[in-house]
Structures are given as structure tokens and as C-alpha cells.
Amino acid sequence: MARAMAAAWPLLLVALLVLSWPPPGTGDVVVQAPTQVPGFLGDSVTLPCYLQVPNMEVTHVSQLTWARHGESGSMAVFHQTQGPSYSESKRLEFVAARLGAELRNASLRMFGLRVEDEGNYTCLFVTFPQGSRSVDIWLRVLAKPQNTAEVQKVQLTGEPVPMARCVSTGGRPPAQITWHSDLGGMPNTSQVPGFLSGTVTVTSLWILVPSSQVDGKNVTCKVEHESFEKPQLLTVNLTVYYPPEVSISGYDNNWYLGQNEATLTCDARSNPEPTGYNWSTTMGPLPPFAVAQGAQLLIRPVDKPINTTLICNVTNALGARQAELTVQVKEGPPSEHSGISRNAIIFLVLGILVFLILLGIGIYFYWSKCSREVLWHCHLCPSSTEHASASANGHVSYSAVSRENSSSQDPQTEGTR
């Protein structure tokens, strides 16, 4: 009998292969599933898998099977009469397959996703009369990283040092970190294994030469990862500790004796903030009429002893710095003319020019009129000259003498008394 069974096995295998071949004229029966499914480490994930059967097509599904590439045996099977069976019953579950129902949905849920679960899986439908249909799905296991950024507080060193730190912890795959800044600088990025197996922690340092100019400025850490819908931006406010930088303001180079008051301000920029201001002169203490009020020096009134070099010394936790200002007091207040504004001077000059132009026009018309009157009188004068003669009765009589004749004859004058 055993020999009979052994002889029957080849015939049985041929029969099974024949049953698995689709008969001629049957429509396309296909399995639908995404090529890749992402899942997060420690969470559950569903591998979708559906059988699409054309209308009016008679298809009988006898079994659903899931297998992983590179491993022998099946990880999950659902038989039409025997129900489900799993290689890990606590981690695997068919989502929709039920006894007594049509087996069209082979979707499989996996719980407690592990790094080693990443790989290629095959979903297979055993159908009749079409035969077996399958599709491959790649399961991508991700770990969403936690991101932080913090400032590295530094002092003036004159050398490049880390001034900001950005960390992306426990990512799978490793996160990508970049920096954005207008201050220059360069990144230094490193990776170490994360707390969970298969994860990576990425640390990036922003390196720059510290100075007072970058204190309080911002740099941005940009973190990109497959699990993010958009990059995460983390802003870091830089901190540089430095001693005071001091200057004195308020002197306009126009102080004079007897001026009611004047004020100077000691401008200091430092980190940490200044803790003290001290005013003095190069000759020693301040004169009595100069009163220090913190960052300000009130001078009331302005007198000759203030005609010196003033010193403001500022202190903070890192040291002390000072600034000097030389004051020269004038004998008297500015003249009134010095107070005339530029606009007033411009209007005054324009007024004088207009007056001179009008005066010139008036003189021109006056002389023009006089010249015309002189010419008119000359036109009325006769061409002959009159000569006076005395009459017999003692009266003087005049006779006209031609100018032409007067040139050849001497004038004759008669007179009787």
C-alpha cells in the first residue's frame, strides 16, 4: 500500500498544478496593495492587501497566506474552514478575514513594531479556478526623533568655539540637521546609537568666533526626517559674555561759561549688565558743581574747572572698562548770528538779491526817461542865434543873425545912453 501511495504522489502534484492554472477565457484577478507601508517603532501597523475580482467572475478563495522574504514557512495563514494561524499570535492579526465569509481582504495587522520587522512581505491568495495570486509589500520601520536646540554660553576667546547645539534623538533613519545664519560660522555634526535598537542620535554644533556683535543674535537649526510632514525649525539666541564697551555722549563742543547746566551720559554695553559707574577727571575727583548720577553726569552750572578730560569707568562681573572725553568751555554764549538757521540765511540772501535787481531795474528806467527828455529839448532849439542891441530909448532890442553870416562878419552892436 505504501508503494501505491508513493506512486500516486506525482499524479497528485500534477493535479494540483493543473487546478492552480487559470482556465482559458477567465478575466484578470489581481491583488491590490501598496508597494511600501511605513510604520513607527513600537506602534502597530496594517499591511493592506485586497483581491480584485472582475464582475460576473466566479472566484473561490480557499486560503490567505503571509510570508516574509528570506524566511522559511508562513507567518500568518487563514484557511476557509480552519481559520487563522500565526507564527506569533500576540503580534499578528487578520483585520477582516472571518470564517464563513468571502475571503477578499487579507490585510494583516502587526503589533509592537520592531526594527527587525522591516523587510519585504508577500501577500498570497489561493483561488479556484484562477490559481494563486500574490503581491509584495515593503514594510518601512521608522522612529520619530525628538529634537532640541540650546545655546552654549561662552566668553570672548578669539578662537572658534561651539555657540549653539542641536540634537535629534532616537531617529530611524538618522535625521538631517542644517544651520541657517547670517553670522557665518560652520557646523560640526556627529552620530551615536540611540537608546532603542536601530535608532540614531544626531548632534550638530554651530561653531563661531564669539564677539560682542553676535551676542543676542539668532541662529536657526533645521531638522528634516521622513516622519515629519515638514522640517522642524529651532531658533537659538546666542549668548556671549564680555566686559563693558564704554563711550560718553552729550557734549556738542559748544559749552560756555555761565551755562545753566549740561549733562553727559556714559553709554555702556556689556553682558552681564554693568554693576557700577564711576566718574572722575584726569586731574582727580570731580569739581563740586559736577554731580554723578549713575550713568549720567550733571554739571550745574558750567564753569572753568570742568575744562578738563572727564573719565567714566564702568564695571561688570567680567571686569572694568573706561572712556574719556575732553571738554573745552568757551568764554561766552554763541552770538545771535550763530543762532540763525540755514533757512533764515538763505531767505535773507534771496531778499537782498531781489532788492538789488529791482533797484537796478528802477535806475535803468529812470536814466532812460531822462535821456529821452534831453533829446526832445534839443530838437526844439532854433538854428539861428539872437543878438542884443540897444534902441534909442535905452531899451535893448534883439535881432537874429544867421550862423552862416556870423562866421564871416563881426557882430555890430549899437548902444546910446
UniProtKB/Swiss-Prot annotation:
Belongs to the nectin family. Glycans are attached at N105, N120, N188, N218, N237, N278, N307, N313. GO terms for biological process: heterophilic cell-cell adhesion via plasma membrane cell adhesion molecules; homophilic cell adhesion via plasma membrane adhesion molecules; natural killer cell mediated cytotoxicity; negative regulation of natural killer cell mediated cytotoxicity; positive regulation of natural killer cell mediated cytotoxicity; positive regulation of natural killer cell mediated cytotoxicity directed against tumor cell target; susceptibility to natural killer cell mediated cytotoxicity; susceptibility to T cell mediated cytotoxicity. Residues 368-417 are cytoplasmic. Keywords: Cell adhesion, Cell membrane, Disulfide bond, Glycoprotein, Host cell receptor for virus entry, Host-virus interaction, Immunoglobulin domain, Membrane, Phosphoprotein, Receptor, Repeat, Secreted, Signal, Transmembrane, Transmembrane helix. Residues 368-372 are annotated as: DYNLT1 binding. It comes from Homo sapiens. N-glycosylated. N-glycan at Asn-120: Hex5HexNAc4. Induction: Transcriptionally regulated by SHH. Residues 145-237, 244-328 form the Ig-like C2-type domain. The keyword ATP-binding does not apply. Contains 1 copy of a cytoplasmic motif that is referred to as the immunoreceptor tyrosine-based inhibitor motif (ITIM). The phosphorylated ITIM motif can bind the SH2 domain of several SH2-containing phosphatases. Mediates NK cell adhesion and triggers NK cell effector functions. Binds two different NK cell receptors: CD96 and CD226. These interactions accumulates at the cell-cell contact site, leading to the formation of a mature immunological synapse between NK cell and target cell. This may trigger adhesion and secretion of lytic granules and IFN-gamma and activate cytotoxicity of activated NK cells. May also promote NK cell-target cell modular exchange, and PVR transfer to the NK cell. Residues 1-20 form the signal peptide. Residues 21-343 are extracellular. The modification Phosphotyrosine is found at Y398. The chain crosses the membrane at residues 344-367. Disulfide bonds join C49-C123, C166-C221, C266-C312. It comes from the Eukaryota. One of its GO terms (cellular component) is membrane. The V-type domain is necessary and sufficient for virus binding and uptake. Can form trans-heterodimers with NECTIN3. The extracellular domain interacts with VTN, CD226 and CD96. The cytoplasmic domain interacts with DYNLT1. Binds with high affinity to TIGIT. (Microbial infection) Interacts with poliovirus capsid proteins. This is Poliovirus receptor. Residues 24-139 form the Ig-like V-type domain. One of its GO terms (molecular function) is virus receptor activity.
